[in-house]
Amino acid sequence: MVFADARVNDLEALMPGMIDFIVSRGVNNYNGDPYPKLYIVNEQKVCTGAYGKPMDICDIAGYYNDDTNEIFIRDKPTKNMTEDRFQEVVLVHELVHFLQYHDGTWQKVTCKQELESHAYEVQDAYVDLYGIDPQQKIDPLFGLLSSMCPRANPMLFHQHLHGGD
């Protein structure tokens, strides 16, 4: 657990610069809200927290809990990511969601999936800026599909059969 604590401290030290980087992209604002508490946890805890029900496996690298102002990041990369600054890349993505929640963007979107689009753009720009392994960038097709609103695209999300969001 000592490694995780040291890693959390290292990542927390990066938060102010990451917030500045995100804000400099011209979409989000930082209003001085307390930074989120950061946790590095195993895959099961990330999956269960992200889906709100017990799950052992998923392909989610981390998530921001707006109720508790906490970010949870996996201790190991997902199958589509590499070790190269993995947790740092996930943190910058989740900090976009932190800002979206606190600057009101969260309430302005048609569906929560739309929030992913800007987080992916920031993540990719961060990877490029710091020369991080390009595999840490979002696959363009995945990015497109995961940021679409299910209700607006029923044929893609089988809502014509199942209904609801």
Predicted regions and their residues:
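Short pre-active-site segment immediately N-terminal to the catalytic Zn-binding motif
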Residues: I73-L91
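Flexible, surface-exposed loop/gating regions in the mature catalytic domains
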Residues: K53-P54, G104-T110, F142
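Short, low-complexity, Pro/Ser/Thr/Gly-rich segments in the mature regions of secreted, periplasmic
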Residues: G143-D165
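Auxiliary, metal-adjacent structural segments of Zn-dependent hydrolase domains
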Residues: A6-I71, Y130
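Mature extracytoplasmic domains of secretory-pathway proteins
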Residues: T82, L99, K108-V109
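Post-HExxH zinc-binding segment in Zn-dependent metallohydrolases
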Residues: T110-L145
